């Protein structure tokens, strides 16, 4: 069987359970890894990316609460790097355990990834990316008083949430390193939380206060390492049009042109499914012989047994 190079972008539900303790998240990560090892067993080369919204949000709360002259709060880019280490550590250990249980001898590595953005991206003037937990209006005002530069908005009636800029990625600094690891058959965890956003200043990289959409970062990484497939794992088995309406339709095999027509019809929610669709379109346009798949973690077994989920091709 020909080895496929696959980038798998994990949704937040693959890491965080209702219990935000380290032990609970470690357990959730291991259950996720058990599903992903099925790809390895059939010879695929895996590059794993993941979200970090809840984790980085909680770290920011801790930073703000203990901010003092002796223990100054770290900026958002540094906190993003902290979350990559945290989640990467959990995931590496989970892979090592599950691989041992399956009798597979493979190495696993986490790469703290820097995602290059344009410092002039319009996103910096319009923070939209929600991070961290939901607050009541009073709690949000309290958080804002602690960190006056933070922006909070009401999120679809579920409460108030901090929002930060989310510029589009234009490069991945560590892509050549990740490529070498994958070619050496190392399972690689990278672009966690979309990577640490950095902007070029001459021959330097400067961290910026932002969060990169992990799906867009995963697409850029898949493009740069020449992945054969991009799998975006989310909470549903398939993408739907006319969602929650009597004529709801499940999409199985769909072309880029069809998806672009659906976007014109406003078929996909801007805050959730639309970025995933845009990611899939961008990837397939950049690599026309490849395919993108949007499905759920629980549907991975069906995907491996036969084509499942929503499969996007040129």
UniProtKB/Swiss-Prot annotation:
Q: Which Gene Ontology cellular component annotation is one that this UniProt entry carries?
A: cytosol
Fetch the CDD domains from UniProt.
AAK_CK
Keyword Ligase: yes or no?
no
- Could you tell me the EC number(s) of this protein? 2.7.2.2
Location of this chain's protein in the cell: Cytoplasm
UniProtKB keywords: Arginine metabolism, ATP-binding, Cytoplasm, Kinase, Nucleotide-binding, Transferase
Q: Which reaction does it catalyse?
A: hydrogencarbonate + NH4(+) + ATP = carbamoyl phosphate + ADP + H2O + H(+)
Q: What GO molecular-function term can you cite, just one?
A: ATP binding
Q: State the InterPro entries in the record.
A: AceGlu_kinase-like_sf (IPR036393), Asp/Glu/Uridylate_kinase (IPR001048), Carb_kinase (IPR003964)
Write the signal peptide boundaries: none
Which biological processes are named by the entry's GO terms? arginine deiminase pathway
Q: Identify the pathway.
A: Metabolic intermediate metabolism; carbamoyl phosphate degradation; CO(2) and NH(3) from carbamoyl phosphate: step 1/1
Give the principal location in a single coarse category.
cytoplasm
Q: What is this protein called?
A: Carbamate kinase
Q: What is the organism of origin for this protein?
A: Latilactobacillus sakei (Lactobacillus sakei)
The gene that this protein is the product of is arcC
